[in-house]
From Swiss-Prot:
Name assigned to this protein: Transcription initiation factor IIA subunit 1
A matching Pfam family: TFIIA
Protein transport recorded as keyword: no
Gene name linked to the record: TfIIA-L
Organism of this sequence: Drosophila melanogaster (Fruit fly)
Taxonomy, superkingdom: Eukaryota
GO biological process: transcription by RNA polymerase II; transcription initiation at RNA polymerase II promoter
Biased composition (Acidic residues): 264-317
Listed Low complexity bias regions: 146-162
Positions carrying Phosphoserine: S265, S306
Amino acid sequence: MALCQTSVLKVYHAVIEDVITNVRDAFLDEGVDEQVLQEMKQVWRNKLLASKAVELSPDSGDGSHPPPIVANNPKSHKAANAKAKKAAAATAVTSHQHIGGNSSMSSLVGLKSSAGMAAGSGIRNGLVPIKQEVNSQNPPPLHPTSAASMMQKQQQAASSGQGSIPIVATLDPNRIMPVNITLPSPAGSASSESRVLTIQVPASALQENQLTQILTAHLISSIMSLPTTLASSVLQQHVNAALSSANHQKTLAAAKQLDGALDSSDEDESEESDDNIDNDDDDDLDKDDDEDAEHEDAAEEEPLNSEDDVTDEDSAEMFDTDNVIVCQYDKITRSRNKWKFYLKDGIMNMRGKDYVFQKSNGDAEW
């Protein structure tokens, strides 16, 4: 079973590598960085493993420790249980620690190592103790981060030449992203705390660096004296209007270039008038030919029966199943109501797991 699932994983990895290799030139022609392809491949693999369709069964062990031999003697069995209880009590006493007023509280957290961690670090399936020091008086601060703030930092790092990973370029341009804008306290204000305004902008504005051009110093200074709710509303309306105007200008610029730079409408009209005179006779001949062809096609077509109708209910019943096999038929044999199938080169999904095979046989009766 593990060998079959390993083969499935190899097939999926081969497909991923083939797709990434074939689209690499197209991405490079569009100016997309090579790192984006590598991230796409890694995300694809992570989603494949997260689906658990090709989850590998863990190794049973390295074989260095033989399985324990359990005797049928009840006395020896009781003695073994007593030794196990003593060992557990000793472990509990060792791990116990006193907690004082100014002391730190330590906890042992058992993390179950995955198959990948076990293979890399040499630790088989077990509990890995990790000690965490947490001060009872000064807990560690939490730093919440949002997707928009992360994208802003990455975009700033990319503009300053730090060589960050262009994750913003991989987003859908029409996706709406929240962006947090921090306003300093206005001059002469009693409170020195800064305010955070949240606006919604499409990802295309972040990809094309339009937001930094819209948020000018004059705009920020004009809304600093407004309340937080009103300032957010005014800023959102200004950004929406600016983005709409920019998109409208792009549409007009693209429409102007459709006919070409040196095109003349007068010449087109004169040529069209001459062409209309010459093509009147040709249109009449084409209409006659089309009518004759339609009559011939109508005579050859057979009338449809009710059995030929395709309804949505049939397709829903066909694919409403938990187990699916996609393969090629080698041959089919039948003896009365017993059928035998010989399949080849297929993949099947059984109970949420994927399996590949070169040859397979199946029996059915109906």
